[in-house]
Amino acid sequence: MAEAANSDIQTYKTFNDFFTRPLKVGVRPIANAAFICPVDGAISQFGSIQQDQIFQAKRHNYSILALVANNTNLASKFENGHFACLYLSPKDYHRIHMPCDGNLKTMTYVPGALFSVNPNTAANVPNLFARNERVLCEFESVQHGTFVMVLVGATIVGSMATVWHEAIDGVKNGIINPPRSKNIRTWTYLEKNIFLKQGDEMGRFLLGSTVVMLFEKDTLQFNVDWQPTRGIKLGEEMANAL
C-alpha cells in the first residue's frame, strides 16, 4: 500500500477499486529504452516467434493465428517476429501500460475458457493463452510498426477494461467483460485518432492474469538481463530497437 496513490484502505468503496488501485506518480520511473515493461509481474516467456509458433512452455507451443482468433491478415504480420508473455499474480499492480508509443487501430474481444494462467498451468495446459477469454488490442507505431497487446482472462479474473472503452465508447469504467458473449466482437478506431504514449495506462485486470505482446520481425532486441520467471516492474527496460 505504500506505493498506492491512495494508501488509506478504508476509503476504497469496492473490492474492484482496491485491486485496481493506481500507483503514486513517480514510483515507477520510465527507462530510457525503445520498449519498456508494461506491467509489474514476472516473465513467463519471451523471444523469437518461430515462423508462426510461440513458445509457451516445454513441449507446448501455440500459433499466432490461434491467439488472434484466426485473423490471417493480423497473424501474418508477426511471423518470425518477437513475443513477450508476462504474468501478473493477484498481489501485483493490476494496471497495464504502453511499452512504446502507439496509435490504436482495433480492439477485439474473443470468448474462451477461464483456465488459471499461473506458471504451473502454463506448463501443463496446451494452447492456454489461445484458449482463454482475451482482448486483442492492435496498435500502429511510427517507429516500430504494428504491435499487439493481448489481455488474457483467467480464473476469478472478473473483468478486463481499457481506458478508451470508457472515454471513446462510453462504457462505464471501460469494462469489456462482462457482458460476456459467445461471439467475437471487434471495435475499429482508425478514424478516432487515439494515441497513447509510452508509459500511458491502457487497461487493467481485476486480480492477476497475463499479457502477451507481439511485435514484427526485426524490430527489437530484448534486455539481456531478462530470463523466464524473473520479476519485473513497470517502466524497466524491456527491449531496444533494431
Where do the PLM segments sit?
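Contiguous, well-folded functional domains in the mature portion of proteins
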Residues: M1-L242
